Amino acid sequence: MKRLFLSFVALALLAGSIAACGQKGPLYLPDDEKAKKEHSKDRYGF
């Protein structure tokens, strides 16, 4: 029973850490073409 509980806790922590990944910052839609070009790629240029 203890092993099952520890497995569940480990799975929950793993899922939480994966869900926390992603871009940070405000979400918005750029209004003009210049802003669209500047922000079309992510921060690291991939």
Curated annotation (Swiss-Prot):
Q: Which Pfam families match?
A: LptM_cons (PF13627)
Q: Which GO terms describe its cellular component?
A: cell outer membrane
Q: Enumerate the UniProt keywords alphabetically.
A: Cell outer membrane, Lipoprotein, Membrane, Palmitate, Signal
Lipid attachment in record (S-diacylglycerol cysteine): 21
Q: At which residues is a lipid of type N-palmitoyl cysteine covalently attached? A: 21
InterPro entries named in the record = Lipoprotein_LppL, LptM_cons
What is its subcellular localisation?
Cell outer membrane
Signal peptide positions (record) = 1-20
Principal location = membrane
This protein's membrane topology, according to the annotation, is:
Lipid-anchor
Q: What is this protein called?
A: Lipopeptide
Name the source organism.
Pseudomonas aeruginosa (strain ATCC 15692 / DSM 22644 / CIP 104116 / JCM 14847 / LMG 12228 / 1C / PRS 101 / PAO1)
Question: Which gene does this sequence derive from?
Answer: lppL
